[in-house]
């Protein structure tokens, strides 16, 4: 599946690595960040950055940021919401592409 933009729902080194690869592939990268990370390298590296009013664990805010930015897909990185089957389902139900294992696989991994 091909897309032109992704929102990276993570921070730090993993966000930088995801963005580096995606930008090499010609994909626009959108970062989300909290105030404490406003000057972090991953925010500066992104083509666009959206400040979250809460935390990296606020799935609804992340989906809202994806819609606001026009992102076509969400890459969760690791940790945070990457192992949350309900979040993966919510991403898909909002007509966004989930870059990661299916919600079913995430649930099975947790059992």
Task: Give the residues covered by each predicted segment.
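N-terminal beta-alpha lobe that positions the nucleotide/phosphoryl donor
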Residues: 1-111
